[in-house]
From Swiss-Prot:
It is found in: Virion; Host cytoplasm. It comes from Variola virus (isolate Human/India/Ind3/1967). Autophosphorylated. Interacts with host JIP1; this interaction increases the amount of MAPK bound to JIP1 and subsequently increases the activity of transcription factors, such as JUN, that respond to these complexes. Interacts with protein OPG198; this interaction inhibits the repressive activity of OPG198 pseudokinase on viral replication factory formation. It catalyses: L-seryl-[protein] + ATP = O-phospho-L-seryl-[protein] + ADP + H(+); L-threonyl-[protein] + ATP = O-phospho-L-threonyl-[protein] + ADP + H(+). The gene is OPG187. This is B1 kinase.
Length: 300
């Protein structure tokens, strides 16, 4: 359905005129609105992922919580966005859910494609630090992102040095009342996410924990450097079991993973991925140590 021209009424009774379609993904379509600072994200209510996003926005991504966390951690920017409003729209046959969220600029995937499918090492390390800061914030609220990839990392419209990790349709609550979720497989959760970057735990049906997000970021950084992961071509065939098995094969062979993907083994990525692979499912990572590794790669 094309929503352009429709007037949507949100939960606060404000009205939004839907403009042209500017993006479409696995978790909804994105349109401009009559306010240039915001876009509207729409999907059928029955799909459920936008409800997951809405809940995450309203429970976790409160401006006061974000600002307090930044102050307490002495971090100037956290790449999460907030939700301006939400609501439901009913057509003749289908009910839709919509969110009104911040309008951003181009995504990192477009930037990489415009640069011959690779970024300089310094840029990759700096992006890695920004995403590490962002997932640390999410993790300390008890949630994992579950779908880190270049197309879900978006530049600020005005300040190109600010990045945002968006699309919260696969966030998972791994911590509740101070207790980590148990290490129990759920067949309905197997292979969630983007197959090429899905963490091994998710392949097996476990809730993505902190180590899963860090694992995915490691795979992404290899790709951003221009590497081709050993399972990239397999992922295109949608053979989930073979992708999972191939990832598992490299868990204790990080040097081989990097040499196969990049034809060289950047010291910082070797350290980063080795440290990720040493984490247990329940373990809280030493984010400062990970940050230090990436800083070394960016500045030395």
């Amino acid at each position: 359905m094309n929503f352009q021209g429709l007037v949507l009424t949100d939960n606060c009774k404000n009205q939004w005129v839907v403009g042209p379609l500017i993006g479409k993904g696995g978790f909804g379509s994105i349109y401009t609105t009559n306010d240039n600072n915001y876009v509207v994200k729409i999907e059928p209510k029955a799909n459920g992922s936008l409800f997951t996003e809405q809940a995450f926005y309203t429970r976790v991504l409160k401006p006061s919580v974000i600002e307090e966390w930044k102050k307490s951690h002495h971090i100037s920017h956290v790449g999460v966005i907030t939700c301006k409003a939400f609501g439901l729209y009913k057509s003749i046959n289908t009910e839709y859910r919509f969110l009104v969220i911040n309008r951003l600029g181009v995504d990192l995937d477009a930037v990489i494609r415009a640069n011959n499918n690779r970024l300089p090492k310094r840029s990759v390390m700096l992006v890695g630090i920004e995403i590490l800061n962002t997932i640390q914030f999410m993790h300390e609220q008890g949630y994992s992102h579950g779908n880190i990839k270049a197309s879900n990392i978006v530049l600020d419209q005005m300040d190109k040095n600010k990045l945002y990790l968006v699309d919260y349709g696969l966030v998972s609550k791994f911590m509740s009342n101070g207790e980590h979720v148990p290490f129990i497989r759920n067949p309905n959760k197997m292979d969630n996410g983007t197959l090429e970057f899905t963490p091994i735990d998710s392949h097996k049906g476990y809730v993505v924990s902190r180590r899963g997000d860090l694992e995915t970021l490691g795979y992404c950084m290899i790709r951003w450097l221009g590497g081709i992961l050993p399972w990239t071509k397999i992922a295109e065939t949608k053979n989930c079991a073979l992708v999972s098995a191939t990832k598992q094969k490299y868990v204790n062979n990080t040097t081989t993973l990097l040499m196969t993907s990049l034809q060289y083994a950047p010291r910082e990525l070797l350290q980063y991925i080795t440290m990720v692979n040493s984490l247990t499912y329940f373990e809280e990572p030493n984010y400062d140590k990970f940050r230090h590794i990436l800083m070394q790669g960016a500045y030395y």
